[in-house]
Amino acid sequence: MIATTRDREGATMITFRLRLPCRTILRVFSRNPLVRGTDRLEAVVMLLAVTVSLLTIPFAAAAGTAVQDSRSHVYAHQAQTRHPATATVIDHEGVIDSNTTATSAPPRTKITVPARWVVNGIERSGEVNAKPGTKSGDRVGIWVDSAGQLVDEPAPPARAIADAALAALGLWLSVAAVAGALLALTRAILIRVRNASWQHDIDSLFCTQR
C-alpha cells in the first residue's frame, strides 16, 4: 500500500510504502487444499502474537507517562525538602584509614563514620558516608530533610524520564516475551503433530504396498 501526503496547495510532501503481511493473512483464509490445518493455526497464532504486541505499545506508553508524572512529583518534592549540610566526624577510632585495608581487598571509595551536624539550632548525630582516610574533626558533606534527619541526595529530575522509559519498555517486553513464548510453544507442538502425521502416512503407505 502506498500513501502520499500533500500540503494545502496540493504539492506532494511525503510518499511512503507500507507493506502488510498479505501472505500470512492469505494463508489463514486460503482454501488451498495444500495448506494444512496446522499451517492455518500457526498463522493465526502468529497474527495474534503480532497484534497483541502492537496493541500493547499505547498501553506501555500510557504506563510510562504515568510513571513519569509520579516520579517527577517525588523528585520535585525531594529537591524542595532536602538540603545540603556539613557534618563533623566525632570518633577517630571508628574511622578506617585507607592504608590499613587488606591488600587483597578491592580499594574502598567510601566508608561509614560517626558524625554530628546542626540544623536549625538542633544538634543531631549518626553514621555518614566519607572518603577513606577521614579523621576525627574532618568535615563531610551530607543531605538532610526539613527536620534535620539524614537522607540520601535528591535524585535529578531527569531520572523521571529514564524511569518512564524503563517502565514502558519493561511492560512491552514482558507482553512481547509472553506472546513470543506462546508462539514458540505452539510451533513446537504443531511440529510434533506434523511429524506424527507424516509418520502415520508413511506407515500407511508401507502397509498398503505389502
From Swiss-Prot:
Chain ranges passing through the membrane: 43-63, 165-185
Primary localization: membrane
InterPro entries with a match to the protein in the record: MT1774/Rv1733c-like
Biotechnological applications listed in the UniProt record: Has strong T-cell and IFN-gamma inducing capacity in human tuberculin skin test positive patients, indicating this might be a good vaccine candidate. Has also been seen to serve as an immunogenic antigen, inducing gamma-interferon responses in whole-blood cultures from M.tuberculosis-exposed adults in Uganda, The Gambia and South Africa, also indicating this might be a good vaccine candidate.
Protein name per its UniProtKB record: Probable membrane protein Rv1733c
A GO CC annotation given for this chain: plasma membrane
This protein's record includes keyword Transmembrane: yes
Keyword terms, alphabetized: Cell membrane, Membrane, Transmembrane, Transmembrane helix
Membrane association type: Multi-pass membrane protein
Subcellular locations according to the entry: Cell membrane
Induction data: A member of the dormancy regulon. Induced in response to reduced oxygen tension (hypoxia), low levels of nitric oxide (NO) and carbon monoxide (CO). It is hoped that this regulon will give insight into the latent, or dormant phase of infection.
